[in-house]
Design a protein with these regions (language model features):
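N-terminal presequence-like segments and the immediate start of the first folded domain
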Residues: 1-60, 64-77, 83-142
Length: 142
């Protein structure tokens, strides 16, 4: 499956300051997958103490879900991420930026009060889109 999205060209606003797009266009007729929020819980029920380790597990879980639908991280069009403190923003962003440098999706990062278990410091949910034929390169719509 081919990714069904492309960044929306934008002018007149500050450029993204990390690996994300201000806007992402999804092709008509694309198949969508909505992933529930993934926590840093390993298959062996362990939780790394650090945000970066938890983010790696979150994205590995997302990758497994997308593979079940015949997709990959390259198909992600939107990320909503939640961390429990400002100190977790940079470690989360390092993982996200490394994984999405080539195909930066639209992305939001929020600081929240906590999750279902105190040891969780990051939760990630995504939307992915795919079509059999990729979007043609064309001028943006007015």
């Amino acid at each position: 499956m081919k990714p069904a999205h492309r960044p929306v060209p934008v002018s007149g606003i500050a450029p993204p300051f990390a690996a994300y797009s201000h806007g992402v266009e999804v092709a008509p007729g694309a198949r969508l997958v909505f992933c529930s929020g993934q926590l840093g819980l390993g298959a062996d029920d362990t939780v790394p103490a650090d945000c970066e380790g938890q983010a790696e597990i979150c994205f590995a879980n997302v990758k497994a879900i997308l593979e079940g639908a015949g997709m990959s991280l390259a198909h992600v069009v939107r990320i909503n991420a939640y961390v429990t403190g400002r100190e977790h923003m940079a470690p989360y962003m390092r993982v996200r930026d490394r994984l999405f440098a080539e195909h930066p999706p639209a992305s939001t990062l929020m600081i929240v009060g906590g999750f279902t278990r105190a040891e969780f410091v990051v939760e990630i949910e995504v939307v992915a889109a795919a079509i059999e034929t990729p979007l043609a390169e064309e001028e943006p719509r007015s």
